[in-house]
Amino acid sequence: HRVTFLDRDVSALADLHNNPKAAVLCSDLETSAHFPIGGQPFDGVVVTNFLQRDILGDICDAVTPGGLLLYETFGTGNETYGRPRNSKFLLKPGELIKTVRANFDILGFEHGLRRIPSPAIIQRVAAVKR
């Protein structure tokens, strides 16, 4: 499978530079004026520890019908355990599943305390796009 990696710091992905099946894009989605992979279809999208509400729809749109979305990030209540503490970066209860439910079949959803690797309040969803 071809894989596209997108992060604001791609230094940990340097070993993928010569891999013909890997595309590495450096972009800070919190400050970017546009969604850098908009319009490109993906059979699977994985998002971890990231929330930028104004592009959440773009992320979901990037998944092809029949494709898989795996999304996990921090939720309200995480302030007790560490960063992020700013509500701008914390999902409200049920926010992720409400956003995804319209166009995806939900395979699994969790909201609560994750203990490993470190305590945090998270929301995560696995869903297939209709």
Annotated model-derived regions:
Residues E30, H34-G44:
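A short acidic, Gly/Pro-enriched loop at the edge of an enzyme's catalytic core
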Residues G112-R130:
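Core SAM-dependent methyltransferase catalytic element
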Residues H17, T64, R101:
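Short conserved AdoMet
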Residues E79-G94, I116:
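Acceptor-substrate binding/catalytic loop of class I
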Residues G66-E79:
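Conserved beta-strand signature within the Rossmann-like core of class I S-adenosyl-L-methionine
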Residues F50-T64:
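A short, conserved alpha-helix within the catalytic core of class I
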Residues H1-A33:
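Class I SAM-dependent methyltransferase SAM/SAH-binding core
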Residues S87-E110:
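Short alpha-helix
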